[in-house]
Amino acid sequence: MVVTTEAVTSRSERDAEPVQEPLVEKLATEELNILVAVRCRGRNEREIKAKSSVVVDVPDNGVTNEVSINTTDDVGIAAKMNSKTYTVDKVFGPSASQKLVYEEIAEPLFQDFIKGYNCTILVYGMTSTGKTYTMTGDEKLHNGELGDAAGIIPRVLFELFDTLEANKDDYLVKCSFVELYNEELKDLLDSTNTATNSDNKKLRIFDSNVNGTSASGSSSRSSSRNNSPRSAPDNSRAQMLRRKLGRHNTTGNSKISNNNHNKFSRFKQTSQESTRAHASNNHQNVHIPNNNSNNTNQQQSPIDQSASIYIQNLEEFHITSAMEGLQLLQKGLKQRQVASTKMNDFSSRSHSIFTITLYKEQNGELFRVSKMNLVDLAGSENISRSGAMNQRAKEAGSINQSLLTLGRVINSLADKSEHIPFRESKLTRLLQDSLGGNTKTALIATISPAKMTSEETCSTLEYASKAKNIKNKPQLGAFIMKDILVRSITSELAKIKSDLLSTKSKEGVYMSHEHYKDLHYDIECYKTELEESKRAIESLTAQNAMLQQERLSLKDDNACYKANIASLKDNVVTLQSSLKEQITKETNIRSLLKDVQGANEEMKKTIHLFEFKQQELQQSISTFISDEISNIRDTLKKHIEYLQNNGDLKDTEISGNLMRLEKEVVKVIKAAEEEASKSYGECVKMMLKETPRLFESVSGRLDNISKLAEENHSKIAETLSDVSEEYNNLKQYLTNNFFKNNHEELLSHHVQNTYAQLEENSAQLMQNFTMMLDKHIQENKRHMLENILGVTDEVINNELQMFGEQRAKWEKSSALINQCDSVNHSFHQALGSNLVEIRDVVSSSRDNIGATISSIQSRTRNRQSIEEMIQGNDVIRQQITRIKQKNKSLSLFKEHSTETATTSIGSVNKVEGNLKVIMDKVLNDPQLSRGKAEVPDEELHRLEKIPLGITNKENVVDLQHRYPALQEKRKPEDEVLLQAKLQRRNPD
């Protein structure tokens, strides 16, 4: 919203007359108790010199809600038992800082004030207890900032404008400062309060619902009890009003131009209107006659819609910054009544109310009005103790009287009496809405811990505890239309112009020497700044051309950087694919290791089965041979006995021959049995000897392979983790940070905005400074481009420096990948050598076992049968021949003997057949002759394609070409069997 001169002149007198619209929004809320806090200071020098003991028990640090006072002379436990305890909302000890008090008490009320509620903070207590220190404190700035001792009022001012600027809402802020001294009101900000016009400017309290002087058009609102002061003629500049009521587009980059523009605007307005009314920012002292007749309505604020109690002739000052408000506070404090007493060197002799009125944009054309009253009450004092005399005694009596009335009001409100004596004192009338009204109120009671002031301390705590029971019903402030606010400001400006014109027509404008010096100093400053602006514009023009060249250079650099980024992205994609391949290889290694371990377990099971079969075979052979030999012996004995019983063989010596025959047969059978047992024993021993050695070697090689695989896996995992981390960092940096600042657009946008802003600011100076303005713009532009160029170089250097670190990390990740490949290659070579050794051991064991089996087979073939052995025995043949010769005479028994021999031969043949069956069973057992299994060509071809090593994925055929030891395409049976087992366990 912008207030223009045309709008002011086009308004009719009816529009200039303030009219209040019925747009008051009162939101009823629940009743709230007054927030009561107690602040206890430490003992001062007077109390320490008087050796007054501490009788108040409060925490030195932190915040509690209880305070105890010892009203007796007891000490120790008795003192604690007889102490009187008061409960309030907050209790602050001597070490509590000003910041802590503000955050705990004033900060919540300040937030409500911003939301639109009327708020009041009162400081109450005995003299010299720190009321003014709590409310005002150190109001001076130190290095442009508030000190630690700053009180509530300075902190509220600074936080108010910080909050409003952060919210970026339209707003208007006014301040007033009133003093109640000896039951008389005084405007502490009125610099024209002289003896000649003191009667005209006398402040009076009015009640709008009973006094007909409320000419602002507001209806009687008896339910609203607002004690805020009324508006006086506005003394702020029209430029300030336009800045706060309207949205302006000035930026922080054109600070020099804005300062020049503001200073020149103030100078121009001063030269045209000759003066300003109460210009608090520049400490000007303009004397304007007060034509107050028939103007009572104009001095009342037309925007204070809900006020029921107001102060006539109290001036409100527009402020646009916390510094301006702080200057008003300091100005009022200088005029406040202060005196020295025996209890306090700087004792406030009056009550003061500093009021901040906020008009804040709510919804478009509506502004909400809220007030914050910061009340510093004078301290009650004992006249005999303070040494007050004459005028000081009168002041003390007036202070005590007003505080006594305040105490009665607090008691009446706490007891919920029907009659509340607000009108018995001007102080209570001003605080009427703060006590039991529609505001949010906080009371800070200040006390002394010394025993010499225990009575006053008890009285203060009694009032504080009773005030805690007072309930207020806070309501949001009223709404006001924006055009009504503009009409009010227009009316005030019109009155100021009228007063200035009347003053000019009489005797000119009176201006103080200080004001004149300020104006003269401002003019000299303007001239100096104009000269500097000329030089700045010239330099800015030259640097503009340089900046254009830099811009083209930056475009080329940007293209190069984009190409580098594309190349880096390709490298990142390559690295990512390499990482995936390494992960796949690692997975294959793990799978192969599991398969080898499974094959090892299966071979161990086969060994156990072989040992079991060997024991079973030995037992079976031993049992069978023993049974058959027993049967043969029994048969031969039976036939021999039969022959002996049926013939006389002594003469023919058949019995001797038979005995020798029997012995020779038994000898041959035992020799055959021993030879078979020896052959099978040697075979078994050889197999038992070779098999553990074979599997021990295989197990050792497998352990080596497992260890190598684990080491390789850990190295690869660590390396891949580092590579992945560096890759993610590089990717995040390239995505989020690398040249994402749009430097070209920022530079172009910044230059255009700066140039447009300079032109806009210069438009208002074109009337008198056309030629100088062009040079001023060029010089400012040169300075701005110079600064922008420096910032651009710094940004680019920072980007390149940050990218250098990322690039170094990326190169490090490439080295890690190369290291990973080297580790994989070493593992592949070690794995190949171990597999070759395993194959050699398996082949050697296979050859040994095959030789043993061949030896057994050759021995078996050499021993064709028992019959051939018997027939080849000369002794047996001779004995049989002799028997035949001797038995020629025994014709009757020839056939029987032949049958007996035939039966014996059949039994021997049966033994021979059974031995052959057993040998065939041993030699043809599928579980003991797996080494002879043949693998089909298709299966062998498929086994040859199984990956050996995962780095280069070489198959068996490729590996045979590399290692001479594996030139054979057909692998040994045991290796084929191992590969088949691995294939069955992992068919993919």
Swiss-Prot record:
Q: What SUPFAM superfamilies does UniProt report for this protein, alphabetically?
A: P-loop containing nucleoside triphosphate hydrolases (SSF52540)
**A GO BP term, please?**
meiotic sister chromatid segregation
Chain positions covered by the region annotation Disordered:
206-301, 965-988
Chief localization: cytoplasm
What ranges does the record list as Low complexity composition bias?
208-237, 281-301
- Coiled-coil stretches are 514-619, 707-769
User: What GO terms are given for molecular function?
Assistant: ATP binding; microtubule binding; minus-end-directed microtubule motor activity; plus-end-directed microtubule motor activity
Q: Which residues form the Kinesin motor domain?
A: 33-470
Location(s) in or outside the cell: Cytoplasm, Cytoskeleton, Spindle
Q: Its GO CC terms?
A: astral microtubule; kinetochore; kinetochore microtubule; mitotic spindle; nucleus
SMART domains named among the record's database cross-references: KISc
Ubl conjugation among keywords: no
Checking Gene3D superfamilies in the record gives: Kinesin motor domain
Regions of compositional bias (Polar residues) in chain numbering: 248-280
Query: Which InterPro entries does the record associate with it?
Result: KIF11-like (IPR047149), Kinesin_motor_CS (IPR019821), Kinesin_motor_dom (IPR001752), Kinesin_motor_dom_sf (IPR036961), P-loop_NTPase (IPR027417)
Question: Which Pfam families does this chain map to?
Answer: Kinesin
Could you confirm whether the keyword Transmembrane appears in this record?
no
Q: Compositionally biased, Basic and acidic residues: which spans? A: 965-974
Q: What does this protein do?
A: Elongates the mitotic spindle by interacting with spindle microtubules to generate an outward force pushing spindle poles apart. Following spindle assembly, CIN8 and KIP1 apparently act to oppose a force, possibly generated by KAR3, that draws separated poles back together.
Please state which protein family the record places this protein in: Belongs to the TRAFAC class myosin-kinesin ATPase superfamily. Kinesin family. BimC subfamily.
| Matching PANTHER family | KINESIN FAMILY MEMBER 11, KINESIN-LIKE PROTEIN KIF11
- Report what the protein is called: Kinesin-like protein CIN8
**Record organism:** Candida glabrata (strain ATCC 2001 / BCRC 20586 / JCM 3761 / NBRC 0622 / NRRL Y-65 / CBS 138)
